[in-house]
Amino acid sequence: MTAFELSGEPLTAREREVLTLVVAGLTGRQIAAELGVSRHTVRSHMDGIFAKVCVPNRTVLTAWALLSNTVSADDVRAVWRRWVSQLEAA
């Protein structure tokens, strides 16, 4: 568990997946499309992440995720590659 996970409850696999997409810069709508879920479901995952990590916003969440190595630069690059290839295919 990292220092900011103050609730004592670790992030779920799905929350980590959502977090990676947030760090890559995707919007709630884009995350929902990427995961094949509703925006409401994404919001629920975000609420869970914010409750566990205890940060005030997505900017601080992104900084925390990178500085704590919860999300790696390689994870972000993989998301970007996927999105670029989707844009090129369109």
What is the role of each PLM region?
Residues A3-L6, A51-A90:
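Basic, Lys/Arg-enriched C-terminal extension of HTH/homeodomain DNA-binding domains
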Residues E9-P10:
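Residue-level "hotspot" positions that anchor or transmit function at local structural transition points
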Residues R14-E15:
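The N-cap/first-turn positions of alpha helices
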Residues T20-A24, L66:
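Short, locally clustered residues in the helix-turn-helix/winged-helix DNA-binding domain
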Residues G25-V60:
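Recognition helix of helix-turn-helix DNA-binding domains
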